[in-house]
Amino acid sequence: MKESIAKVYRKTGETEIKSEINLYGEGKYDIKTGIGFFDHMLNLMARHGLIDVKLEAKGDLQVDSHHTVEDVGIVLGESFKKALGDKKGIKRYGTSFVPMDEALASVSIDISGRPYIVCDFNFTVDKLGGMDTELVEEFLRALAFNVGITLHARVLYGKNNHHMIEAVFKALGRALREAVDRDEKINGVMSTKGTL
């Protein structure tokens, strides 16, 4: 599989983020956002998606983690979009169900060029490791809208909030891997319109 590398740099009054990804990597990661729990989740996404991710984010964490988490989603979304290029030969769709002990999550993706997100999960704590749990959806929204994908994420059941969120991020990585996988039998893009 050939490499598909993209670099993105973004600086605002709230954050400064630089990323480099290889969609067809080995799942290597070097991620530093200043939010330990978020780093852990992004590491899982990269590893289980076999996507190489190098990312450094500096944000206004003295305020809270919202801007950093959302802007990381924006930058990773832009990186994925850039790395996908013309989307020729990709399978387009990806779905993954991932168990994490008592929790089960699913993520389904359509690299359609039409950004949309549906999240169906309810966490029972407000924070995990310095990250507001409501920011899981904010991250997924920023990612989906900046790649241009339809993304459905669901926790079917679970009790431990860490396990539920971990299952979502692992499923995200695996669904991305499936959707970006290239098939030599696909001539052009996987659409009757001829474009994605």
Swiss-Prot record:
Source domain of life: Bacteria
Main localization category: cytoplasm
Entry's localization field: Cytoplasm
Extent of the signal sequence: none
CDD domains, sorted: IGPD (cd07914)
An MF annotation (GO) of this entry: imidazoleglycerol-phosphate dehydratase activity
InterPro entries recorded: IGPD_sf, ImidazoleglycerolP_deHydtase, ImidazoleglycerP_deHydtase_CS, Ribosomal_Su5_D2-typ_SF
One GO BP: L-histidine biosynthetic process
Annotated Gene Ontology cellular component terms: cytoplasm
Gene3D superfamilies: Imidazole glycerol phosphate dehydratase, domain 1 (3.30.230.40)
One Pfam family cited in the UniProt record for this chain: IGPD
Protein's pathway: Amino-acid biosynthesis; L-histidine biosynthesis; L-histidine from 5-phospho-alpha-D-ribose 1-diphosphate: step 6/9
SUPFAM superfamilies: Ribosomal protein S5 domain 2-like
Catalytic activity: D-erythro-1-(imidazol-4-yl)glycerol 3-phosphate = 3-(imidazol-4-yl)-2-oxopropyl phosphate + H2O
Enzyme Commission code: 4.2.1.19
Alphabetic keyword roster: Amino-acid biosynthesis, Cytoplasm, Histidine biosynthesis, Lyase
UniProt cross-references to HAMAP family, sorted A to Z: HisB
Family, as annotated: Belongs to the imidazoleglycerol-phosphate dehydratase family.
Record protein name field: Imidazoleglycerol-phosphate dehydratase
Organism name: Clostridium botulinum (strain Kyoto / Type A2)
